Each structure stands twice: as structure tokens, then as C-alpha cells.
Amino acid sequence: PTSELAYKAAIKALEDAKVSAEELDMIIVATISADCNTPSTACILQEKLGAKNAAAFDLSAACSGFVYGSAIATQFIETGVYKKVLVVGAETLSKFVNWHDRNTCIIFADGAGAAVYGEVEQGYGMLSFDLGADGSGATTIEIPGGGSKHPADQESIDNHMHCLHMNGKETFRFAVKAMGSTVMKSLERAGLQKEDIDYLIPHQANIRIIESAAKRLHLPMDKVFVNIEKYGNASAASIPIAMAEAYQSGKLKKGEIIALSGFGAGLTWASCIMKWAKED
């Protein structure tokens, strides 16, 4: 289940941050493939970790979810309400694809990534973010069955309504515009220019979308982290997995300006600008 992948990523993040589970004030799990409708995967993860002092909830913003969660986490920290927040992006989308539908089954993946947010020195950490949604595109990427509108029954199962459906052309058209424009808004809010970006970590959906966003931001591809060829599209897990790999490979240096950018079902989009605070 998704909670197992979330647990493995969370343990690694806590170890790297040198934070115990009991120190966590909040757990946010971004996912569209929760273990079940209720309880939340975050509550299941809280129990697995032994994070008995943490509030816990799931967040459904699809591939934008990790950035949404990161924005929420840092607001709680900046206001002084909480000190340590765990944000996890976790998915098991292999369980939600129709294996006869090449629009989805060869693209979507399982995975999890996590980050622990806490207080950092002045001027570092989250500098700005941009979150957005356009519900008029709700049917562009959807799992129509299994909810209160189309509860599970024989007809919905026969019609694969519990599986992920995607209009690839519409998704591409939306993504190419959204990826670059949301980063530009975050840069503006941070008082920065696109030339100030040291590294872009985009949602790993499609290499052409990533290249298009990089071109719009005038970024050479050597400043853009890409690992889609290894994992495919892991939805909410894609950005934290990429961020962890970029960090572990020594690509993220303290003081550098890092941009995260995602888009997904909803339709949703999100970006944030960080000044990397972690030592090598």
C-alpha cells in the first residue's frame, strides 16, 4: 500500500534531518492513491512512525501535491505554531491504471519521497510559492469511480471507472503553459529573476514538457534535474524523489536558489522558490 512507501521515505528523511518521529508536530501526505477513503494515509503513517505528537492529514492535489504540502508546512513554521513538519509525496498508481490503456499504463508509477521542514537561518528556506487551480479542467485527468458520485458497483468496474483516465493532448497543452508561468509568479513574489535560478526541479511527467518549461525560463538543461527515464510519472512523489536524488548527488549547494514546479489533476499547478539551507 501507499503507506508502506510513505513510511520508507519518511524514515530516510527523518534520519537525514536528525529528527525523531516524536519531534514531529505535523505530517502531511500528498497522494491521490491513498490506502483507503478513510482513515487518511497520514494517520496510518503517523502510527507506523510512532509520531504520537503529530497532527496528520492527506492532501489531494495530484502531481502538485508535494509543493502544496510544502507551502502549508512552511507557513505553520513561519508563524511559529509548529517547529517540525514532515511532508511526504507517495503514490501506488500501478493499482489505478487500466493495463490496456497505453495513455496511462506506460506513464504512471509507484514511489515516495519526503522532506522534513523546520526552522532555518534568516533568509534561507522557502522564499515564496504560487499555488493555483482550474476546476473547469477536472475531467482532463481523473479517476471518476469509487467516490460518492460513482460508487463502486459492477458497472463502474466493467467501465474501468476506478482507473486513471487522461486526455494526453489537453494535459500537454495545459502543462507547457502552467510549468513556466507558475515559476515566474513565484520568482516575482521572491523579488528574483529567472536568471537567479541555480536549479529547477520539475514534476517528472514528460521530457518535452520539462524542456519546454526550461526554454521558457531560459534555463539550460544542465540546470534542470531529470530522472523520468528511471521512474516515470510518480505524481505527488515525483518532485520529492527528484529533490532527494539531486541533493544526494551533490547538485544542491547551500545558498543556491532552487525552484520546484508541478502541475496535475484538478487541474492544479504549484511552484516554490527555496534558498537551499542544508549543508552538503
Region spans (language model):
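Conserved active-site "lid/cap" helical segment
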Residues: 1-25, 149-198, 209-217, 242, ...
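Buried hydrophobic positions in well-ordered alpha/beta secondary-structure cores of metabolic enzymes
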Residues: 13, 24-27, 45, 69, ...
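Short acidic capping loops at alpha-helix termini that bridge into adjacent secondary structure
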Residues: 20-26, 53-55, 83-85, 193-199, ...
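Acidic, glycine-rich active-site loops and adjacent beta-strand->loop/helix elements
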Residues: 30-35, 61-64, 89-94, 132-134, ...
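Flexible, glycine-rich active-site loops centered on histidine and acidic residues
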Residues: 78-112
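Catalytic phosphate/nucleotide-handling subdomain of diverse soluble enzymes
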Residues: 241-261, 267-280
